[in-house]
Curated annotation (Swiss-Prot):
Name listed for the protein in its UniProt record: ATP synthase subunit a
Organism of provenance: Solidesulfovibrio magneticus (strain ATCC 700980 / DSM 13731 / RS-1) (Desulfovibrio magneticus)
Keyword Ubl conjugation (UniProt): no
A single GO cellular-component term on record: proton-transporting ATP synthase complex
Subcellular location: Cell inner membrane
Function of the protein: Key component of the proton channel; it plays a direct role in the translocation of protons across the membrane.
Main location: membrane
Keyword terms of this UniProt record: ATP synthesis, Cell inner membrane, Cell membrane, CF(0), Hydrogen ion transport, Ion transport, Membrane, Transmembrane, Transmembrane helix, Transport
Molecular function GO labels: proton-transporting ATP synthase activity, rotational mechanism
SS bond list: none
Segments traversing the membrane: 35-55, 61-81, 94-114, 128-148, 151-171, 190-210, 211-231
Family per record: Belongs to the ATPase A chain family.
Signal peptide residues on this chain, from the entry's feature table: none
Amino acid sequence: MAGGLPHPVLLVDEAAKSVGLYKLNDVFHAQVIDSNVIYAWFAMVLLIILGTLATRKLAMVPSGLQNFFEVVVGGLESFVVENIGEKGRKVYPFLCALFLFIITGNLIGLVPGLDSPTNNVNTNAAMALTVFAYYNFWGIRMWGAGYIKHFMGPFWWLVPLMLPIEIISHLARPLSLTLRLFGNIRGEEIVLVLLFALAPVVGTFPMYFLFSLADCIQAFVFFMLAMIYLKGSLDHAH
């Protein structure tokens, strides 16, 4: 099953079963570790391997994987600094790691025999709650008790109206991040399953380009929204 959907043999699932990670818990009769966690770990290991290969022989004139990672990482850093300012360098490592994990998690779901950790609502909720905690942490760290001014509006007489609106708005952010990514990736899985059922494997190849593009866009949207939330917490409240 791929996120609850029929799927070809999942290679990482089979490997996990062989080492006992999918043994049933005697009390709750559930898997010791859920499959979406296994695939999240797989995405992390893949990124670590690629990062190690890219930095194993650093050169002044980059090529291959080093060149690819320098373009991606450097481009993301420039984007963050342009939008947040120099303060963005403090939060950039978090944003970059978030983007790389999401795009890797999205894309591995397109590989036959693998599944995407981001088509599970729990994975996305964990990332969304981490973003929520992280930008509020930076807001409190930067402004202390004055961070509450971000929720009060520009005039004191608007506080009774703005405070509840802002609180609801901020609480809705993790839900929005979770459902946006989950809905898009799960929808992609459903379409892939239907295409495999209705058309030969070769007939699905053109869709892979479209889905790859959509996966990259969804990763960037999540990254950009997290950056906007961080920018709001780092900027001075007016």
